């Protein structure tokens, strides 16, 4: 999300008005990206001899970034999700398009235009520090996985062991992004199909959506819900009327809101908790794809359970992140590489 041209005063104004309350506009998935490979290919102690201080090094960067640039947390978590869902968890999202090249890298895709620089910067800084201690040994994809976990934990979420041993991918193509990233108006059918193509269950779909507890969205991603829901020229009937009025104040129908972002969980936007799910229970979901989880009989019971039991959600989220982190893992020189600069192939 390329944001916060939103002022602090307008954030607090929005939070004051809404006592209750990772995103792009739908397109079903057609490709068949790699499903998770067995965890035997990854291990928590993969670098125990090669770079035993790895997690301490990455942690020193993430803790500093969290204090100085808190938006780095949701930005990096979203970056990890977008990486894993396209080519697998291989750091391909970090590649920059070569100057003058017509072959655009993943990060140039429309669906990735709102990925914030704070997320990329966090990984670049962590990689530079790791390289100074363990040159050419640690993949960018492993650093991204560790950093995402760190930010989740720093924000109040679960601490889980990150299995490591990923190699960085050798390709990054913008055209592969659209069918593999959920949209802000995706239907539950589309979401279930997409997540299933990655080897993830309906429960894991709902649980991983809980990362929106510290997420933000641009007005354009939910403007249709406010003014012209599915071409009716009316707002989404599932939207709480108080919230509708407040959102229209922040996001006018035309002009003046291109840089405005609003929290997906306005009660605790920088705390990783189950507030996202309690918001859905009172029709305070900002995105149509979020609120849909509370309207569909396949997903509503899971969302209700997560809203009722914070600890159960946190445990389930850590487990789901662990599983997601094994999607499309690359191993060995035939399939991958260990980049020294996360932005360019070797």
Swiss-Prot record:
What is its cofactor? Answer: heme b; Ca(2+)
Does the UniProt entry include the keyword Cytoplasm?
A: no
Catalysis: reaction(s): 2 a phenolic donor + H2O2 = 2 a phenolic radical donor + 2 H2O
One Pfam family, please name it: peroxidase
Signal peptide region: 1-31
**Residues binding Ca(2+) 2, per UniProt:** 213, 265, 268, 273
Q: What is its EC number?
A: 1.11.1.7
As for subcellular location, the record says: Secreted
What InterPro entries does its record include? Answer: Haem_peroxidase, Haem_peroxidase_sf, Peroxidase_pln, Peroxidases_AS, Peroxidases_heam-ligand_BS, Secretory_peroxidase
Q: Where is the active site?
A: 82
Show the CDD domains listed in the entry: secretory_peroxidase
Q: Which residues are glycosylated?
A: 185
Q: Using the chain's own numbering, where are the disulfide bonds?
A: 51-134, 84-89, 140-342, 219-251
Recorded GO terms, molecular function?
A: heme binding; lactoperoxidase activity; metal ion binding
Q: Where does heme b bind?
A: 212
GO BP term, example: hydrogen peroxide catabolic process
Among its keywords, does the record have Chaperone?
no
Question: What UniProt keywords apply to this chain's record, in alphabetical order?
Answer: Calcium, Disulfide bond, Glycoprotein, Heme, Hydrogen peroxide, Iron, Metal-binding, Oxidoreductase, Peroxidase, Secreted, Signal
What the record notes about the co-factor is: Binds 1 heme b (iron(II)-protoporphyrin IX) group per subunit.
Q: Report residues binding substrate.
A: 182
Per UniProt, Ca(2+) 1 binds at 83, 86, 88, 90, 92
Identify one Gene Ontology CC term for this UniProt entry.
extracellular region
Misc remark: There are 73 peroxidase genes in A.thaliana.
Functional note: Removal of H(2)O(2), oxidation of toxic reductants, biosynthesis and degradation of lignin, suberization, auxin catabolism, response to environmental stresses such as wounding, pathogen attack and oxidative stress. These functions might be dependent on each isozyme/isoform in each plant tissue.
Family the UniProt entry places it in: Belongs to the peroxidase family. Classical plant (class III) peroxidase subfamily.
Q: What is this protein called?
A: Peroxidase 19
Q: From which source organism is this entry?
A: Arabidopsis thaliana
Q: Which gene encodes it?
A: PER19
